[in-house]
Amino acid sequence: MARLKITQTKSYIGSKQNHRDTLRSLGLKRLNDSVVKEDRPEFRGMVHTVRHLVTVEEVD
């Protein structure tokens, strides 16, 4: 199964509270933090919510 490397590239300062909560639930705490998650619809939805704050790469 494919995996996603999610990196926070922009600050959440000034963002809505639900965007901050989504970043926290993805495991991103500060700028340039990266996490690797399973490629599942739940994580795709979270990434879609904060797509303006993160970059996503597929990792094998």
Swiss-Prot record:
Gene Ontology MF annotations: structural constituent of ribosome
Chain's gene name: rpmD
Record has Transferase as a keyword: no
Pfam family, one: Ribosomal_L30
Taxon lineage: Bacteria, Bacillati, Actinomycetota, Actinomycetes, Kitasatosporales
Transcription regulation in keyword set: no
Organism: Streptomyces griseus subsp. griseus (strain JCM 4626 / CBS 651.72 / NBRC 13350 / KCC S-0626 / ISP 5235)
InterPro entries hit by this protein: Ribo_uL30_ferredoxin-like_sf, Ribosomal_uL30_bac-type, Ribosomal_uL30_ferredoxin-like
Domain of life: Bacteria
BP-aspect Gene Ontology terms: translation
SS bonds (residue pairs): none
Protein name, as recorded: Large ribosomal subunit protein uL30
CDD domains: Ribosomal_L30
